[in-house]
Amino acid sequence: MAWISLILSLLALSSGAISQAVVTQESALTTSPGETVTLTCRSTTGAVTTGNYANWVQEKPDHLFTGLIGGTNNRAPGVPARFSGSLIGDKAALTITGAQTEDEAIYFCALWYSNHWVFGGGTKLTVLG
């Protein structure tokens, strides 16, 4: 669970990170209950690789943050199996298989660059219910 604390701390401090890399995500996506949805994370420095240790963090409307995925594809303890991380082409991806209304949230991707993390702006996922 230590990596989750690290990610949350870095999320709070990410505005102070100095980097030439920019991490981009879809600003918003909409899905329906039971559908599969994939959120992606791209780097301006080139293809995202396992060396970027892609992390995914969920922010619920009440500002509760939960670390979902670390190291590209390692699900955090207690995270439902419907959440999975991977690399698709040149991007990191978070796939939710069988989305539920409770999955409506903002999802942040963070990529590692040698000595610091860079966060994307987040994807607001709406689950129509």
From Swiss-Prot:
GO CC field: immunoglobulin complex
Domain Ig-like: start-end pairs: 20-125
Post-translational modification Pyrrolidone carboxylic acid, affected residues: Q20
InterPro entries to which the protein is assigned, alphabetical: Ig-like_dom, Ig-like_dom_sf, Ig-like_fold, Ig_sub, Ig_V-set, IgV_Light_Chain
Any one Gene Ontology BP term: adaptive immune response
Keywords: Adaptive immunity, Immunity, Immunoglobulin, Pyrrolidone carboxylic acid, Signal
Pfam families: V-set (PF07686)
Entry-linked SUPFAM superfamilies: Immunoglobulin (SSF48726)
Entry-linked SMART domains: IG, IGv
Stretch forming the signal peptide: 1-19
Name the UniProt record assigns to this protein: Ig lambda-1 chain V region H2020
Source organism: Mus musculus
